[in-house]
């Protein structure tokens, strides 16, 4: 499986860096946003005013050699500084709030939308890609929205304010300084673009190093058995050498950039000193020493907001990719959607109208069904017809790629037929909601998935309000209690991520117990192909028989010896039923099923003899 979407897919830039698309996520917190913007603006005003305090002190106290009024001046100055500290604390807190709130809402929106997407989306996109959209992209967007907003407001207000004050103090001197602003902007833009490309390359190489390191650890046994230690070392060495070269090149650009900015700032100071000093010594246009000093501070301070704003624009260009990928995820439509009429009556995934749900009995019928995947060209099923009465146990047999999983996926409405209809209790499955159907289906995969948490928490997924007595009865019915009793903490034992702390058989039995609690009318089992011990296999067979009683069931059979009691066995090849009947009937025909069964029986006999 490969990632279908990459960084290069987003070459078209959105207006305003895609930020308007985030407005709905900021609206609930507009009070915090406005308050933060106002306080940041006030902080900018204070930063502009602070050099004026210096000017006043030099001109009125130092130059005149008097201390009259100094106490009041110092008191006012301390109050202003204290006010700025308070504003800064509130700003930082509110920026954190916005980052956390927006990040949380972005994650919720993306995760909730993922719950509504069909299987095809997860087949086409890797887990790593989806994880990056939900976690990395949302974190980066939340950060740039909060801190980027604060930095932009402060730097813009400070930049505009400083230029205005400089022109008020001395417009001729201000022109000399402002004339250098475009030069600084162009220099900053040039170096920032280079640094952005290099930083991106550093991140890419770092990902390669991490991947190579993980492969080296997880594949250590393979590396040793193939005797490729030297090749692995060379590959890892080349990647780390690329990292060294790129990092040094990045550092070189950054050092050059800082040096040029410092030179330009020094040049601006020299201009101010030369021109301002001349004005200070000319009687006609006398300029006070304090005024010259504050002007120099403003000229020097002008460089920082320009650099920051250029860097911010560069970051916005980069984060636009994250915004685009996030909004594309939310815009992705499911291949299987309920019609507006169905949603109106039955509700949707998050707001079901259970009071309108009819009971499901379990009659299933395929009417001239043809199916191909959305991005496929060939049909997996063609003109497929099958009628399964309520309570029938159907076993599906066939080679890999014959269409077995496609059949049960259509029953579960994980995919829609390209042509034809699937009827549930005599009605087109599309006439009722997906949630209604899924609530009445129990699906146990080849490798059952257990959620991180305890055994009890996993069992309650089948029925959240189940009593302990119901849970214990369900476990006993499928013999899961024999596995659970062996665990150190019983029902409170941790199953690990994906159930990794349990054996394959243990996960199977717990998933069966979970299905019993859900009490589905249709049961689907993709039989496990992995080998398990004889005792556990016997327990699983008993569990399957219990689950199938009174329910319509579809079993994708891999071990044919386990389906002898099926009411009907379907032998599928290339999307068509080539044989159907009971085990005895098919064995008497000595057709495709007979060949598969005898071949597997002989193979199992050989394996048992060697074991």
Regions of interest found by a model, annotated:
Residues 1-47, 62-73, 90-95, 99, ...:
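Membrane-integrated ABC transporters
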């Amino acid at each position: 499986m490969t990632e279908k979407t990459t960084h290069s897919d987003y070459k078209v830039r959105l207006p305003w860096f895609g930020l308007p698309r985030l407005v709905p996520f900021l609206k609930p917190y507009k009070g915090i946003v406005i308050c933060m913007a106002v306080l940041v603006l006030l902080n900018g005003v204070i930063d502009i005013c602070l050099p004026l305090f210096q000017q006043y002190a030099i001109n009125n106290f130092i130059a005149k050699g008097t201390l009259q009024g100094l106490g009041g001046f110092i008191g006012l100055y301390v109050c202003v500084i204290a006010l700025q500290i308070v504003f800064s604390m509130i700003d930082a807190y509110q920026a954190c709030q916005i980052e956390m709130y927006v990040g949380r809402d972005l994650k919720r929106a993306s995760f909730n939308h993922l719950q509504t997407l069909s299987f095809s989306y997860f087949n086409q996109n890797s887990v790593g890609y989806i994880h990056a959209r939900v976690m990395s992209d949302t974190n980066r967007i939340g950060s740039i929205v909060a801190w980027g907003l604060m930095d932009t407001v402060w730097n813009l207000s400070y930049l505009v304010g400083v230029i205005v004050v400089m022109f008020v103090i001395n417009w001729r001197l201000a022109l000399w300084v402002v004339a250098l602003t475009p030069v600084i902007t162009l220099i900053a833009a040039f170096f920032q673009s280079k640094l952005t490309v290099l930083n991106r390359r550093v991140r890419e190489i770092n990902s390669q190093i991490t991947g190579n390191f993980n492969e080296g650890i997880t594949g250590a046994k393979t590396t040793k058995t193939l005797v490729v230690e030297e090749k692995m070392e060379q590959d890892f060495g080349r990647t780390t050498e690329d990292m060294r070269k790129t990092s040094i090149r990045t550092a070189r650009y950054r050092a050059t950039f800082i040096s040029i900015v410092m030179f330009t700032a020094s040049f601006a100071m020299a201009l101010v000193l030369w021109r301002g000093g001349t004005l200070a010594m000319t009687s006609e246009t006398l300029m006070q020493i304090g005024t010259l000093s504050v002007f120099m501070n403003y000229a020097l301070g002008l460089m920082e907001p320009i650099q920051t704003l250029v860097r911010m624009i560069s970051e916005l260009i980069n984060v636009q990719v994250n915004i685009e990928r996030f909004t594309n995820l939310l815009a992705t439509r499911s291949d299987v959607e309920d019609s507006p009429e169905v949603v109106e009556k039955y509700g949707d995934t998050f707001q079901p109208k259970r009071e309108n749900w009819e009971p499901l009995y379990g009659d299933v019928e395929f009417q001239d069904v043809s199916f191909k995947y959305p991005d496929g060209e060939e049909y997996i099923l063609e003109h497929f017809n099958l009628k399964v009465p309520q309570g029938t146990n159907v076993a599906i047999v066939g080679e890999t790629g014959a269409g077995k999983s496609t059949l049960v996926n259509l029953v579960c409405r994980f995919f829609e037929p390209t042509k034809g209809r699937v009827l549930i209790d005599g009605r087109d499955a599309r006439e009722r909601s997906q949630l209604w159907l899924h609530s009445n289906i129990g699906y146990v995969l080849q490798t059952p998935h257990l959620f991180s948490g305890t055994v009890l928490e996993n069992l309650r997924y089948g029925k959240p309000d189940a009593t302990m007595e119901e849970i214990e009865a369900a476990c006993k019915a499928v013999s899961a209690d024999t596995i659970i009793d062996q665990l150190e903490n019983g029902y409170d034992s941790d199953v690990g991520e994906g159930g990794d702390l349990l054996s394959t058989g243990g996960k199977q039995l717990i998933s069966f117990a979970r299905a019993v609690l859900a009490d589905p009318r249709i049961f689907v089992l993709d039989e496990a192909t992995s080998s398990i011990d004889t005792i556990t296999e016997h327990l699983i067979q008993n569990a399957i028989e219990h689950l199938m009683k009174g329910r319509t069931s579809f079993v994708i059979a891999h071990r044919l010896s386990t389906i002898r009691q099926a009411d009907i066995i379907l032998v599928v090849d290339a999307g068509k039923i080539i044989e159907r009947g009971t085990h005895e009937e098919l064995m008497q025909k000595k057709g495709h099923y007979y060949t598969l069964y005898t071949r597997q029986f002989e193979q199992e006999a050989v394996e048992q003899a060697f074991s």
